[in-house]
Design a protein with these regions (language model features):
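Bacterial Sec-dependent N-terminal signal peptides
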Residues: 1-4, 17-46
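Sec-dependent signal peptide hydrophobic core
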Residues: 5-13
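N-terminal mature-domain "stem" immediately C-terminal to a signal peptide or N-terminal signal-anchor/transmembrane
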Residues: 39-74
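Amphipathic alpha-helices that form helix-helix packing interfaces
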Residues: 63-70, 89, 96-103, 159-162, ...
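Post-signal peptide N-terminal segment of secreted/secretory-pathway proteins
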Residues: 64, 68-141, 145-147
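Long, flexible, surface-exposed domains enriched in hydrophobic/aromatic residues
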Residues: 208-216
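Conserved small/polar residues in nucleotide/adenosyl-binding loops
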Residues: 217-221
Length: 221
C-alpha cells in the first residue's frame, strides 16, 4: 500500500525538478527563446504548485506552529512545575514531531540547502555533552538570557540541538517524565533548544511560503 501512496509524491517531486530544469534551460538560452510555457510545462507547473501549496506549505506551517507552541508550554512548565504541564509539553512535542516526520518525505529545498535537517534531527544525542552542559554554569546563564535561542543555535552542536535533546529532558521510557525528575536547569536548556528548533522550522515555512505567511513576529534570523 505504501508504494502506491508514495506515487503522487514522487510524481510531484519529478514535476518540480523537471519544470525547474526546463525553466533553467530557457534562462540559459543565449537567444532569449520563447518565454511562453509549453502545454507540458504548464501541466508540470500545476502539479508543482499544487504539491507546494497543499503539501509542503501545509506541513511546514503545522510544524512551525507546533514548535512555537512547544516553546510557550515549556516556559509555562518552568513557571509552574506540575505533572499536567509536563504532559501538555509532551503532547505538543509529539504533535510537532509528527509534522516533522511527514516533512521527511520531501527533504529538498530549504531543509537541505540550509542544513536544517541535521541541525534539528541529528542522532544519536550526545548525552555526555548534554550532561556536561548541565554542569556549565556560564552556559546555563547564557541559556537563561533573552537571546537564548540564538545562543543555542550558534554555540551548541547539532548533537545537542533539535528534537532529541528536548525528548531526553521530557520523556522517560517513552512516557512523560515525572515533574519531580526534571531540574530547572534542564528546562532552561530545553527552552533554549526549543527556541532554536522553532526558528529553524519558521525558516522552512518562510522559504516555501514567504515571510508574510508567518505569524511569529519575533522571529530571529
Amino acid at each position: 500500500m505504501k508504494k502506491f501512496l508514495r506515487f503522487p509524491l514522487y510524481a510531484a517531486m519529478a514535476a518540480i525538478m523537471t519544470f525547474n530544469f526546463s525553466a533553467c534551460s530557457d534562462d540559459d538560452d543565449p537567444d532569449g527563446g520563447d518565454t511562453e510555457l509549453s502545454e507540458k510545462d504548464k501541466r508540470y507547473q500545476a502539479i508543482a504548485d499544487q504539491f507546494t501549496k497543499n503539501t509542503v506549505i501545509v506541513t511546514y506551517t503545522g510544524l512551525a506552529d507546533q514548535t512555537e507552541a512547544l516553546v510557550e508550554k515549556l516556559k509555562a512548565l518552568k513557571a509552574d512545575k506540575t505533572d499536567d504541564n509536563v504532559k501538555s509539553v509532551c503532547e505538543t512535542f509529539l504533535n510537532a514531531r509528527a509534522w516533522w516526520e511527514k516533512s521527511e518525505a520531501f527533504l529538498f529545498g530549504a531543509a537541505s540547502d540550509f542544513g536544517i535537517d541535521p541541525h534539528i534531527d541529528s542522532w544519536p544525542l550526545d548525552l555526555d555533552g548534554l550532561l556536561d552542559e548541565m554542569k556549565n554554569t556560564s552556559h546555563i546563564t547564557a541559556m537563561e538570557a533573552e537571546d537564548a535561542d540564538v545562543w543555542a543555535g550558534v554555540k551548541l552542536g547539532p548533537e545537542l540541538l533539535g528534537f532529541h535533546g528536548i525528548e531526553y529532558i521530557m520523556f522517560e521510557a517513552g512516557s512523560p517524565k515525572a515533574v519531580s525528575k526534571i531540574k530547572d536547569k534542564e528546562l532552561t536548556y530545553a527552552i533554549a533548544v526549543a527556541g532554536d528548533l522553532r526558528n529553524k522550522c519558521y525558516q522552512l515555512q518562510i522559504s516555501w511560503a514567504g515571510a508574510d505567511t508567518v505569524s511569529y513576529t519575533h522571529l530571529r534570523a
